[in-house]
Amino acid sequence: MEDIFNFFDKPKDPLHFSSIKISISSPDKIRERSFGEVKKPETINYRTFKPERDGLFCAKIFGPTKDYECNCGKYKRMKHRGIVCEKCGVEVIPSKVRRERLGHIDLATPVAHIWFLKSLPSRIGNLMDITLKDLEKVLYFEAYVVTDPKDTGLAFGTVFSEDQYQKALEEYSYGFEAGMGAAAIRTCLTSMDLDQLSEQLRIEMQEATSEAKRKKTAKRLKVIEAFKNSGNKPEWMILECIPVLPPELRPLVPLDGGRFATSDLNDLYRRVINRNNRLKRLMELQAPEVIIRNEKRMLQEAVDALFDNGRRGRAIAGPNKRPLKSLSDMLKGKSGRFRQNLLGKRVDYSGRSVIVVGPELRLHQCGLPKKMALELFKPFIYNKLEERGFVTTIKSAKKMVEKEKPEVWDVLEEVIKEHPVLLNRAPTLHRLGIQAFEPVLIEGKAIQLHPLVCTAFNADFDGDQMAVHLPLSVESQVEARVLMMSTNNILSPAHGKPIIVPSQDMVLGIYYMTRDKHFALGEGKIFASPDEVNIAWDAGEIHLQARIKVRMKNLVSDEKPTLIETTTGRVLLRDILPDAVPYATINKVMTKKELSNLVDVCYRLAGNKETVILADKLKAIGFRYAAKAGISISINDMVIPEGKPAIINRATEEVQEIQNQYTEGLITDGERYNKVIDIWAKSTEDIAKEMLDNLSRDTILDPEGKEVKVPSFNAIHMMADSGARGSAQQIRQLAGMRGLMAKPSGEIIETPITANFREGLTVLQYFISTHGARKGLADTALKTANSGYLTRRLVDVAQDAIITEADCGTIDGLTVSSLTEGGEVIEHIGDRILGRVALDDILDPVTGDVLVPANEEIDETLVAKIEAAGLEKVKIRSVLTCESRRGICAKCYGRDLARGHLVNRGEAVGVIAAQSIGEPGTQLTMRTFHIGGTASRRAEQTALEARNEGFAKFININYVTNSEGHHIVMNRNGELAIVDETGREREKYGVVYGAKIKVSPQEKVAQGQSVAEWDPYTMPILTEVAGRVKFGDVIEGVTMEEQVDEVTGLSRKVIIETRDTDKRPRITIKDESGKTAKIGENLLARYYLPVGSNINVLEEIEVNAGDVIAKIPRETTKTKDITGGLPRVAELFEARKPKDFAVITEIDGVVAFGKDAKGKRKVLVTPELGEPKEYLIPKGKHISVHEGDHVRAGEALMDGSSNPHDILRVLGQKELAKYLVDEVQEVYRLQGVKINDKHIETIVRQMLRRVRVKDVGDTNLLIDDQIERWVFEEENEKAMDKGGRPATAESLLLGITKASLSTESFISAASFQETTKVLTQASIEGKVDSLRGLKENVIMGRLIPAGTGLALYRNLRMVAEEPVIIPEPAEPEDEEIYEEEA
């Protein structure tokens, strides 16, 4: 019916536009767009409820309130279309124009637009070169500004206070013009000549001497250039008339009881109109200046409040003391227009309900309650009912559905077939939070979810709810089925390993059936084929876990079957394996890890379809055997180790011993604390180890009656061992000891909880543990928010990283090697290069054969080849070095992790990267409290043991031999390697300064032999020569104080900070003749002492080479938890400078110390050729290099964390990327979370995409401009084509927030943060948004230029309107595992 009214309207096509521009509106523009002036503050008549004429809701200006009906009722209905009623002046048209017609208010005096005034930096202030403070004084009528100096010699734009103005008047009489308020500012802005000003400023900039002046001029120049280029006029920043929003967008809604609910805007407009009308009247009456001035100020304030309430002064509040919501507030923040309505909308055809488990569903199905389906599929049902001839009209179909007649259910079944629905669980942290399923109708009101997809949704069935959405168009159904179906999302986009893996009870069931039991029924029997095993099992002749031998093929490639040792359960499990998967994959105890591997292997060898079938069968068999096993736990399963009292007593004695050392003054309090913590941490680990050994071994009698140790079937152990539930840490607390706890401040309490939960805690122990438990819960709440915010920033910065071309043809890449930490490999090279593309041919180091040709994807088989060849380094293509101008090319990205093949064009890899990094953030934050707040802290490493036997090799180690014959390391970057006979390095360790090496070069080392040791809690200062100790500048009370320990009564000398910059506390070593001893040729044995170091020697005593003369204590350690982790990740991605960052050297060279300057130490680095570079290091910071050390560029000269900006400047992009990737990965690795490197690289690429112009050459760029790298390259190409000089620039590292805000698209930036600031800047520049990214297009309501929305795929249209039938996965032949056993 409603269509009939719009019958005469021309059909409105959606507007086709390719870009959108924002600029400042001129007063003429505002009036031109307006449909009339609003003159009165009235809204509607209180009796008739009709809009008042000329008021805020006036029908004459904004259109009729009812369709095709004028206000007075003279003209009604369609036949009078377009007539203007002569009585009330209302046009007879549809009422929806009230949503689009603007009005305006003519102001009696000009008013400044608050955005251009107060949004920092103030644009009006910048243009006129007046400070914001002065500008406000002028605008709010507290000061005068000179608008025309004429010939008085006053400067244009000088600001006078009232007194100064009177004086100036006396001095110059009326030889100049000055004014106050926005009118005066407008006069100034109008009279500005931008071209002349711009030239003058450019000259000033070249002549400027100080950096500050240059920067200030550059800022002004930027604003002026923006105005010049955009065609905006400066005076438009001052308003003469104000547009009035269409009334439907600021509605007045009658509530019951005769009251009205209104939008705050109406109040704000009313204020403006009232003050404006009063001002007009006062001006007509020629009121005194003071009164008019006050009224003008009030008008300015009213307009300010309308545009941005609370930006200046106190926010205007409504009757309920709540600040009124202004136009800016409508756009800003989470509930503003951008984020609430444009980026995410609520949709129809959706519902939500509680979820329950659906173990009998297939992987691609979900159970949908009939009630829900009936509501969701209504239009489809009506259509089918009509088609079937059950009804003739929609109305009767409606009735039929309401009555729920039997035919309706039949039709519903038919409609649902082949029509996927989307299920979504909030929070949707990654793309697997929305997946498509085929609905199966079920009774009841809860949605049934397949148990295997719970991991992806992070769902459990303790009351979680999920939403259902229905894709309507054929295109969307195809996309849902092909791209979003749960069966097509087996691999996780974050790390490329399967995410559809059995968990919890399924794991337990499969683990139980693949375990082997000693001396079970049928042990040692030999079977000719797996079928025989099945027969024997059905007959009850063999036990499920009996160890038997079967003739069969172990690998698919085997020539003929062989006898294989296995168990009954594993042979039964073999029945569900696809043929392509070798038996060896499951001929072991299947833990969760092994199951994950099985799904992975199946996906690679047998393909997607087989994997889906296998996953479903694993689910069924897992549930079945978990039920059959009937595993339960009792308190007796928590076996407390017998050795526990002994270990605790030993630890208590050690602690007492350390306490005694402390009372004797041998160690400091900090050392004592650290050692005590270490003893307890180690004891806890010992008890845990003994307990786990006990749990995992049972002693039973064999048939001969001898005792044998066999793997145990203890239920708790099985659950943890299989990976079904629980961890060693939790079992440790149940049956070992709870261990150390953390204080609220994060420090560790040095008395641990020696009891466990089985023994029960004492009151004190319980009290200590409450804190940790609560902290866990509080952390969770806080960090979920932080993690969500991190994800939001990441998505925003990476949203335009899309695969746009197949190959960019770059010749650059990254070199990747295995990651080692403390000598052990934590990530193999194979894992790091899998799915990447080789940059050059990868050659076998021995034979020289090509293992992988250049530009080829490195898949599983090639990785095996590379690892077999023993390659240490491989060059691969990387997102960081990709040369695509917009987006990224497929070759540089490599494999699409979720699909297992090279990435497709149009894939939004940036968003996937952001989700992959952000999602575990939330997971991790939610994982703190499960351990119950027990302090997890590794015992510090204090010694190195050789893992392999071989010969010791010193690499770059300077050492002296001390009196005991040990080698003491005297430099920082030395390494100790163990090499075999052929000279190949088997392992390599960095050794710290001051470490004791217990072997000599080339000495034979046995496996497990201790080769080096050091004190992890202090940094020693050692002497390199023997001699007598002499102190310099060690003056008590000035540079040193004796700290007396309250407990021990002993004193120690500690260096303190001093005001006196000339005093440099040091220890000198004198030789026999009393001169300062020399180290080598020309270095003096003089050791400077940093603040906080403890002096270990007395003056005048004799020392030997390698003796410790002073110690610098390290900070006491805090617990490592992702709490430190999440802020750490944010800090890395925000590219913040660390608090005490280390100064690094920019060149290779030799270190020397210069004279101190201004309380800072001067370090000189002298290269072989060229000038030495000097670095100033704050006093009291420990300098980690020694005189005469050789340093490489990028090495730190002092203790502290690295500053990423320095790394970029000194070592370049690749090193920076490597640093960021490694640091971020370390945080996640500590939590056991896997993320592929390429995701972090993608984000880093987005952080590095801008450059800062250093020298403009012959281009149109401005100095210090920050621009996108490809814009810079294009400008240079243009200049060089004309034979000009190219510009130079330096790489910039922007934090993710900065990078998001500096994107090309103003719509995207405005919807992210600081909306008003972004829009202000964009409108001054007259910015054009060419809608290239994802966000801008979502906001404009277009298809996004990624995935199927890419122009490449856009012209593919669905031709067939018939139902698209995609064949079902074939029913598996062997269905017996679904049937219940008789």
Curated annotation (Swiss-Prot):
Quote the cofactor binding remark: Binds 1 Mg(2+) ion per subunit.
One Gene Ontology molecular-function label: DNA binding
Q: Which residues bind Zn(2+) 2?
A: C808, C882, C889, C892
Q: Where does Mg(2+) bind?
A: D460, D462, D464
Q: What class of enzyme is it?
A: transferase
Example GO biological process term?
Answer: DNA-templated transcription
Instruction: Name the keywords, alphabetized.
Output: DNA-directed RNA polymerase, Magnesium, Metal-binding, Nucleotidyltransferase, Transcription, Transferase, Zinc
Binding residues annotated for Zn(2+) 1, in chain numbering:
C70, C72, C85, C88
Which Gene3D superfamilies does the UniProt record give? 1.10.132.30, 1.10.150.390, 1.10.1790.20, 1.10.40.90, 2.40.40.20, 2.40.50.100, RNA polymerase II, clamp domain (4.10.860.120), RNA polymerase Rpb1, domain 3 (1.10.274.100)
Respond yes or no to whether keyword Chaperone is given for this record. no
Catalytically driven reaction(s)? RNA(n) + a ribonucleoside 5'-triphosphate = RNA(n+1) + diphosphate
Keyword Plastid found: no
Q: Which GO terms describe its cellular component?
A: DNA-directed RNA polymerase complex
Q: Which InterPro entries match?
A: DNA-dir_RpoC_beta_prime (IPR045867), DNA-dir_RpoC_beta_prime_bact (IPR012754), RNA_pol_asu (IPR000722), RNA_pol_N (IPR006592), RNA_pol_Rpb1_1 (IPR007080), RNA_pol_Rpb1_3 (IPR007066), RNA_pol_Rpb1_3_sf (IPR042102), RNA_pol_Rpb1_4 (IPR007083)
- Report the EC code(s) recorded for this entry: 2.7.7.6
Provide the cofactor list for this protein: Mg(2+); Zn(2+)
Q: What does this protein do?
A: DNA-dependent RNA polymerase catalyzes the transcription of DNA into RNA using the four ribonucleoside triphosphates as substrates.
Family label: Belongs to the RNA polymerase beta' chain family.
Q: How does it assemble?
A: The RNAP catalytic core consists of 2 alpha, 1 beta, 1 beta' and 1 omega subunit. When a sigma factor is associated with the core the holoenzyme is formed, which can initiate transcription.
Q: What is this protein called?
A: DNA-directed RNA polymerase subunit beta'
Q: Which organism is it from?
A: Citrifermentans bemidjiense (strain ATCC BAA-1014 / DSM 16622 / JCM 12645 / Bem)
